[in-house]
Amino acid sequence: MNNFEVIIGIEIHLELNTKTKFFSPSPIDFEAEANTLVHPIDLGYPGTLPRVNKQAIINGIKLAKALNMTIDSEIHFDRKNYFYPDLPKGFQITQQFRPIGKNGSLVLYIDDESVKIDIERIHLEEDTARQYIKENEIWYDFNRAGIPLIEIVTRPTIKSSKQASSYIDEIRKIALLLEISDARMDRGSLRADINVSLRPYGSDKLGTKVEIKNLNSLNNVKKAIDLEIKDQFQKLINNQEIIQVTKRFNEKDQVLETMRKKESTINYMYFPEPNIPIIKLEQDFIDKVQINELPNEKKLRYQKANINKIYINLLINDPKLSKYFDKINYDDKEKISNIFFSEIVALANKQNRHATDLNIKASDIEDLLKELEQGNISGKHLKKLIPLLVDNQKEIKELLEENKMILISDQSYLRAKILEIIEANSKIVEEYNQRAEKVTKFILGSLMSQTNGQANPVVSSKLVKEILEEKFK
């Protein structure tokens, strides 16, 4: 392998989460029964005219900004002409000549090293119908036909399966944080076509590429690329020809299977879409499209706050969770992250719910932490109180009083109680000079027992120490 350089290019198809399709008013719902969300425009019925979904354009601008791209000042659509059963119109509306974004880049951090991925273009287009097998027959679900998607095309500069899977994962995270797609590979809302080739080191000429499709997980992306690299390497060292083909990854057998041979470049006879006029994008409109904090920015902010690495990954992979976490206004982010995950997220997991579905208000968590900080409740109380915050409409003070969880911090009261315990247990207390820790624990245990665990442990420990040291000095 040392004699050959791996060259990988990736095309990602990212379905956008708009409420309706790109060019028709048909709603989008992944869970809907097959062929129930189909409009005459989706099927190309005569006399139908497309109407552009504005939100799809906005989502395209968001992604272009996130990928540091040059955004075109005009939106042009083109027809890609070909026949296939999943394309009833006989053409796909896409952006061949004037993509919405060009010349971008994305920096990855892999094993503490930065890797820059060059992105050639992103363009908007409509999705095709979904093909599936049912009762040994091929069926088509046209619910997917017309869903807006963005195709993201890298330059052939990716060097390994690890870089490739990291890049796809970063695009997935960006899409989630921008809230433009659910980016689920298992559902097909994020699909990646991988082009792999090898060439001798020092050569400027690209080798014959092999395309890999049907990859439904990041793990399969790595496996498929590594298999293809190994196959091409063996052919090259044995002076065998590499044929340009399209392959798919057979997950069951963990092998690559050839789908079809690419004998020549297909002529799609692109031409401008006659039914959609050119859309001018004013700079003011582009400037008003704001993007959320990106994954690397969010990661850096959490790292600076000393949040656990595992928690950081969970937050970055779940924008809904990170948005909820960030609403909690508390300076010690490390402390709140430990409580947030060990108590709130753990409680949600037990109930098979998302943490946000518990309806625990961020302000209630803040108030609870203030009570803990001020010594009004203990850590044990906090653990007991978290479940009570689910759907809570009461003030925290009211909740504490109802459940008798406010700690006793009155020093006069606690001192009197401690003196009573010492007087009633003089024999044990007399052992203080020989067994200070044992005597102290005994008195504190008795105090907690007499106050039903309400004595403030910090204040109580301090008072017991002061009283005993004064008595035996």
UniProtKB/Swiss-Prot annotation:
Q: Which Pfam families match?
A: GatB_N, GatB_Yqey
Keyword S-adenosyl-L-methionine on entry: no
Query: Which superkingdom does the taxonomy of this entry point to?
Result: Bacteria
**Catalytic reactions on record:** L-glutamyl-tRNA(Gln) + L-glutamine + ATP + H2O = L-glutaminyl-tRNA(Gln) + L-glutamate + ADP + phosphate + H(+); L-aspartyl-tRNA(Asn) + L-glutamine + ATP + H2O = L-asparaginyl-tRNA(Asn) + L-glutamate + ADP + phosphate + 2 H(+)
Q: Please provide, alphabetically and separated by semicolons, the GO molecular function terms listed in this UniProt record.
A: asparaginyl-tRNA synthase (glutamine-hydrolyzing) activity; ATP binding; glutaminyl-tRNA synthase (glutamine-hydrolyzing) activity
Q: Which PROSITE patterns match?
A: GATB
Q: What class of enzyme is it?
A: ligase
Which Gene Ontology BP annotations are present?
Answer: glutaminyl-tRNAGln biosynthesis via transamidation; translation
Q: What EC number is given for this enzyme?
A: 6.3.5.-
The record's keywords, sorted A to Z, are: ATP-binding, Ligase, Nucleotide-binding, Protein biosynthesis
Q: Which InterPro entries match?
A: Asn/Gln-tRNA_amidoTrfase_suB/E, Asn/Gln-tRNA_Trfase_suB/E_cat, Asn/Gln_amidotransferase, Asn/Gln_tRNA_amidoTrase-B-like, GatB, GatB_Yqey_C_2, Gln-tRNA_amidoTrfase_suB_CS, Gln_synth/guanido_kin_cat_dom
> Among its keywords, does the record have Protease?
no
Q: Which NCBIfam families match?
A: gatB (TIGR00133), PRK05477.1-2 (NF004012), PRK05477.1-4 (NF004014)
Subunit info here reads: Heterotrimer of A, B and C subunits.
Provide the family line. Answer: Belongs to the GatB/GatE family. GatB subfamily.
Role according to the record: Allows the formation of correctly charged Asn-tRNA(Asn) or Gln-tRNA(Gln) through the transamidation of misacylated Asp-tRNA(Asn) or Glu-tRNA(Gln) in organisms which lack either or both of asparaginyl-tRNA or glutaminyl-tRNA synthetases. The reaction takes place in the presence of glutamine and ATP through an activated phospho-Asp-tRNA(Asn) or phospho-Glu-tRNA(Gln).
Q: What is this protein called?
A: Aspartyl/glutamyl-tRNA(Asn/Gln) amidotransferase subunit B
